[in-house]
Amino acid sequence: MDQALLDGGYRCYTGEKIDVYFNTAICQHSGNCVRGNGKLFNLKRKPWIMPDEVDVATVVKVIDTCPSGALKYRHK
C-alpha cells in the first residue's frame, strides 16, 4: 500500500496485481469511472471498486480518464 496516498485521504481497494486508491474529498463526480467500466466501478456494490474484476490494463485505462486525480493506482 502507498502510505503517502493513505495519509493524503485516499482509501485503498486492494487487488491481486494492482491497488486502486480513491479520495472522495477531491472527486468531481465526472462519472468517467462508472461509465468507463461497470465491473470495476459499481456504485450499487460494496466495495464499489473491485480491481480484480477486470484486467490490469483496463484498470489503468479507466483511472487515467479521471479528471480530478481522485482515482490513482499502484502496480504490485
UniProtKB/Swiss-Prot annotation:
Superkingdom: Bacteria
Pfam families: Fer4_19 (PF06902)
Protein name: Uncharacterized protein YjdI
Species, as recorded: Escherichia coli (strain K12)
